[in-house]
Every structure is written in structure tokens, then in C-alpha cells.
């Protein structure tokens, strides 16, 4: 399954990813076999892949396993592209551009995890 990770920086308006929750969430999803579509407007692809590789190495994964997991990552230039082929969307940084998306339409076909309380619950239903 492919999961969209929206936001890599530890907070909005920065490219600083040190200790970002997105790193840990993404690595755990990769270990569980997920593929990832990642988007952040300020953190570049190299930084994202380096963050993931560093944590996987620290967890003791071999080079072969690292390569397999890194191949399951797409870093995209738009959050809409990241969402497009994902079954679940995780908002992990509170970028203002995410506020304008029509989340109510998305949740009819995908699951949404809003880790930053960015979206009013009145704007979407999670189908409980």
C-alpha cells in the first residue's frame, strides 16, 4: 500500500528536519512494507532520503535491505501528486497550503490522518 506523507520538516516555514516525527513515522511504515509518496515544500529530496537512510542504518538494516526500502519512496513536487495514488494520507507538518485542499472529497476514497489538527473535523468525516 502507498501512503502519502505530507510534510517532512519538524514545523512549518522551515527546511529543518532534525527530529521530525515524519522521519520516524516513515521508517516504521517502510519496515512494515509500505511504499511512500512524500511531499514537503522546503525540504529537498536528498535531505529526506538521507534522514531515512540514517535512521535505517542506526536500526541495523543491511545495505541490501536499505536499497529495497529506499526504492519504495517517491519524493514529489506537489502534495496533490503525493495524494493521487495513495490509500492513506498523513499530514505531519502544518503547512498552510494543506488547509485549502478539499479534504471532504478525499476522505470518500482514502483514509486521512491529521497529525497536526490542521483540518477542522467539520470539513471531513472519517467514516466512524
Regions found by a protein language model. Name each.
Residues 1-128:
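Structural/interface elements that position substrates and couple domains in central-metabolism enzymes
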Amino acid at each position: 500500500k502507498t501512503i502519502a506523507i505530507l510534510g517532512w520538516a519538524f514545523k512549518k516555514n522551515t527546511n529543518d528536519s532534525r527530529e521530525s516525527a515524519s522521519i520516524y513515522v516513515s521508517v516504521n511504515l517502510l519496515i512494515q512494507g509500505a511504499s511512500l509518496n512524500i511531499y514537503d515544500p522546503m525540504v529537498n529530496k536528498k535531505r529526506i532520503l538521507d534522514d531515512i537512510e540514517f535512521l535505517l542504518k542506526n536500526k541495523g538494516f543491511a545495505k541490501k535491505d536499505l536499497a529495497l526500502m529506499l526504492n519504495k519512496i517517491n519524493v514529489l513536487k506537489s502534495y496533490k501528486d503525493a495524494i493521487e495514488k495513495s490509500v492513506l494520507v498523513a499530514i505531519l507538518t502544518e503547512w498552510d497550503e494543506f488547509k485549502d485542499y478539499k479534504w471532504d472529497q478525499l476522505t470518500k476514497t482514502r483514509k486521512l490522518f491529521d497529525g497536526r489538527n490542521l483540518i477542522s473535523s467539520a470539513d471531513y468525516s472519517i467514516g466512524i
